[in-house]
Amino acid sequence: MEKVIKKIVEYIKGYGDRMIIGISGHGASGKTTLANNIMKSLEKDNLNLINTDPYIIGSHLRKYTKIQYDYRGENHQYKMTACHPAAHNTYPLERDIAMWKEGLDLYTIGTPYTESKLIAAKKKILLVEGMTVAFTDPDLYDLKIYLYTDGTTELTRRSVRDVSERGTDINYLRKSHEERRIQYEIYMHPKRENFDIVIKNSNEGYMIERSCF
């Protein structure tokens, strides 16, 4: 992965203009880790970051929204997960990106777990990271990177992160994982076709499925 990060950073540094980078993928795919590694190699004084989690409709509301979908010849009904496009406030995110692109300062959305911060137009790079990126207009971005992993790796990572860091019940996590993964396969995975770089990232390693370099 270090070689991939190096190529991405070299491309960004050589771009020569203001740049918008979109990084997306399902939960526990490694997108935040990739974003952090890229930022470490760039000048912080010239870099903005928008994490798109605040643009996702909260699970406390989504749990009341049941959707039906067909998968491999079988009908399923389950609550709407963040892998469904309707779970995302895409228009506000697209507006905020467009504001920065037009030279306007803005503030990120404040939440109980993150403070609102300034996104300065004078900075040269805007990095937008999170699931919502996949459902926005791909033409907004100058470079788009998508990560995903297999279902087993995702569950393993979620078991560590969501249980230890977020207090999620392990039995609930395992029960909901299958339907979450099915919704991912139907609604989100096809969006990778809109990205310049596609990386399959698992505990066994990574594979570049597509690269613009």
Question: Residue locations for each model-derived region?
Answer:
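The conserved Walker
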Residues: 27
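Conserved lysine of the Walker
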Residues: 31
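Conserved nucleotide-sensing/catalytic segment adjacent to the nucleotide-binding pocket
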Residues: 48-51, 57-111
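Hydrophobic positions on the alpha1 helix immediately C-terminal to the Walker A/P-loop
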Residues: 34
